[in-house]
């Protein structure tokens, strides 16, 4: 049986196995605390995420079960990888993942990104989304703080707690407002993987213009900002709105023509970047570009390699997600998943980019390491 050490971190009890030493807080959210630590077995730094009180309610337990299942299934070099999981004596759940030095939100708050970094980062985001979407999974909460980056320019998408199956009926309130697709705000009952492409488009725009594109103060203000730039929703979009009040609101808006997106980014922005942005920020999700097709766009040509942009082995098994079990049942299922993970030989982390491919990232890595050093991030 594993031995545990108890520490006090930011006023919170942090229990971890003796495999890990020197926990240091790096993040705190509504669902848990994240600390950096050193893994004495792998001799590598890790991020230890504490999921607090996962068995307090059936909804929390189900969310935790979903996240564990997704982390076990989704394995791709642009997604965060689970390296260990354990349940503490106080019955909190701890998940160890690789530790990356910073996140995109922190970088963007410090200094502007060079255009070549923006280009490489959106490529990796779309590469990860192609894989996620091929597994029939929608991330639903893509934002700069969920994009982790290390000094080698490696990018990984994290936080799958809100991820969902693409299905006919979907709940509406997800994603941080700035990056939320308009079909979610318009209370559609059905939306799909295109919401992640919209979020990625908002992130690309923010990297290019050095500030958020749609910094809405509330739901209504957010929608006004979108229509001020992209114009009024077409009839095909309005017809899919299920709320009469929302339909009346949309129809009451003054007529607005879409602006050229070249007017909302710096004048020296690459034409191909603007062209891709136009395809990602299409109001009608049925005509919005997919992650897979976006990877083929000229803007990403320096990195695009169809032989090195993998898809999932098959769709993720969502059969549990419609279940309405009591928290005790979810607890048993979580314990089973943890034991299953610990009792099998888990595959190694996904391999880094193959240096034999046409793109050699070494020069970009050196420049980005200097960028991080100048920014005080390493």
UniProtKB/Swiss-Prot annotation:
Belongs to the protein kinase superfamily. Ser/Thr protein kinase family. MAP kinase subfamily. HOG1 sub-subfamily. GO terms for biological process: carbon utilization; cellular response to oxidative stress; osmosensory signaling pathway; stress-activated MAPK cascade. GO terms for molecular function: ATP binding; MAP kinase activity; protein serine kinase activity; protein serine/threonine kinase activity. Activated by tyrosine and threonine phosphorylation. Disruption phenotype: Germinates poorly on and is unable to utilize polyalcohol sugars as sole carbon sources. Increases sentitivity of hypha but also conidia to osmotic stress, oxidative stress and cell wall damaging agents. The double mpkC and sakA deletion completely abolishes mpkA phosphorylation. Affects the cell surface and the extracellular matrix during biofilm formation and reduced the adherence. Mitogen-activated protein kinase; part of an osmotic and general signal pathways involved in regulation of the response to the cell wall damage, oxidative stress, drug resistance, and establishment of infection. Required for growth on media where sorbitol or mannitol is the sole carbon source. With sakA, plays a redundant or cooperative role in the conidial stress resistance. Also plays a supportive role in osmotic stress adaptation when sakA is deficient. Involved in paradoxical growth, the cell wall integrity (CWI) pathway and biofilm formation. A motif (TXY) lies at residues 171-173. Its cofactor is Mg(2+). It catalyses: L-seryl-[protein] + ATP = O-phospho-L-seryl-[protein] + ADP + H(+); L-threonyl-[protein] + ATP = O-phospho-L-threonyl-[protein] + ADP + H(+). It holds the Pfam family Pkinase. The TXY motif contains the threonine and tyrosine residues whose phosphorylation activates the MAP kinases. Its EC number is 2.7.11.24. The gene is mpkC. This is Mitogen-activated protein kinase mpkC. Dually phosphorylated on Thr-171 and Tyr-173, which activates the enzyme.
């Amino acid at each position: 049986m594993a031995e545990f050490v108890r520490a006090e971190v930011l006023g919170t009890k942090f229990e971890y196995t003796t495999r890990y030493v020197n926990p240091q807080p790096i993040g705190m959210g509504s669902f848990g605390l994240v600390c950096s630590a050193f893994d004495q077995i792998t001799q590598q730094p890790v991020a230890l995420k504490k999921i607090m009180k996962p068995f307090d309610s059936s909804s929390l337990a189900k969310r935790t079960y979903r996240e564990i299942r997704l982390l076990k299934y989704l394995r791709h070099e642009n997604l965060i990888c689970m390296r260990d999981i354990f349940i503490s004596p106080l019955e909190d759940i701890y998940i160890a993942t690789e530790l990356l030095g910073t996140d995109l939100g922190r970088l963007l708050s410090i200094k502007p990104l060079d255009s070549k970094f923006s280009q490489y980062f959106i490529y990796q985001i779309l590469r990860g989304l192609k894989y996620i979407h091929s597994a029939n999974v929608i991330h639903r909460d893509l934002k700069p703080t969920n994009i982790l980056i290390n000094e080698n320019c490696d990018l990984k998408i994290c936080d799958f707690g809100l991820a969902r199956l693409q299905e006919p009926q979907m709940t509406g309130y997800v994603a941080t407002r700035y990056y939320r697709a308009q079909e979610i705000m318009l209370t559609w009952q059905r939306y799909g993987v295109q919401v992640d492409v919209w979020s990625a488009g908002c992130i690309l725009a923010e990297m290019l213009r050095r500030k958020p594109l749609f910094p809405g103060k509330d739901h209504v203000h957010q929608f006004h900002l979108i229509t001020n730039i992209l114009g009024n929703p077409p009839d095909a979009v309005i017809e899919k709105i299920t709320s009469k009040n929302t339909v009346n609101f949309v129809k009451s808006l003054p007529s607005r023509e879409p602006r050229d997106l070249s007017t909302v980014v710096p004048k020296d922005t690459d034409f191909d970047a603007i062209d891709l942005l136009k395809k990602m920020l299409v109001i009608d999700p049925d005509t919005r570009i997919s992650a897979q097709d976006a990877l083929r766009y000229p803007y990403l040509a320096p990195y695009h390699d169809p032989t090195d942009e993998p898809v999932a082995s098959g769709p993720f098994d969502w059969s549990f997600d419609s279940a309405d079990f009591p928290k005790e049942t979810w607890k048993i299922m979580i314990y089973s998943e943890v034991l299953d993970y610990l009792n099998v030989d888990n595959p190694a982390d996904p391999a880094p980019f193959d240096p034999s491919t046409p793109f050699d990232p070494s020069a970009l890595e050196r420049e980005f390491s200097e960028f991080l050093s100048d920014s005080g991030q390493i």
